[in-house]
């Protein structure tokens, strides 16, 4: 069993896509790369040092990688939610329609990554038990 956080994200994404989206993994390398983005470093420092920036690059990486034959946006969204939950965080007051709209806007490049991170920050709250 691995303790690498990117491996845990990879395993979650594959499991979710297979069970909820009927998506088959068509590029393990692309998905592993996307799941590793939040943890990339340069000169010993994280490139994305905050939970917000890590969450933003995670979702962007998964949806743009097209690692599955179906369900890339849904899998990216749910992996984002899983990532936040692992950090005892969640998104507040986000309807399914709003979540879909923000993901589609990111995928179609109508929403910049920095603006998406800002959107996450606006909705981020501690996860209550």
Regions found by a protein language model. Give the residues of each.
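FIC/Doc superfamily catalytic core
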Residues: 1-129
């Amino acid at each position: 069993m691995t303790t690498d956080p990117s491996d845990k994200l990879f395993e979650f994404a594959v499991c979710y896509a297979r069970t909820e989206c009927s998506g088959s993994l068509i590029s393990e390398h692309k998905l592993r790369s996307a799941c590793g983005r939040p943890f990339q470093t340069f000169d010993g420092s994280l490139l994305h040092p905050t939970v917000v920036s890590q969450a933003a690059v995670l979702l962007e990486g998964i949806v743009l990688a097209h690692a599955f034959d179906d369900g890339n946006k849904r899998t990216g969204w749910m992996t984002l939610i899983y990532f936040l939950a692992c950090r005892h965080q969640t998104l507040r007051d986000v309807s399914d329609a709003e979540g879909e709209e923000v993901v589609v806007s990111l995928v179609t490049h109508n929403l910049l990554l920095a603006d998406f991170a800002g959107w996450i920050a606006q909705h981020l709250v501690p996860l209550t038990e």
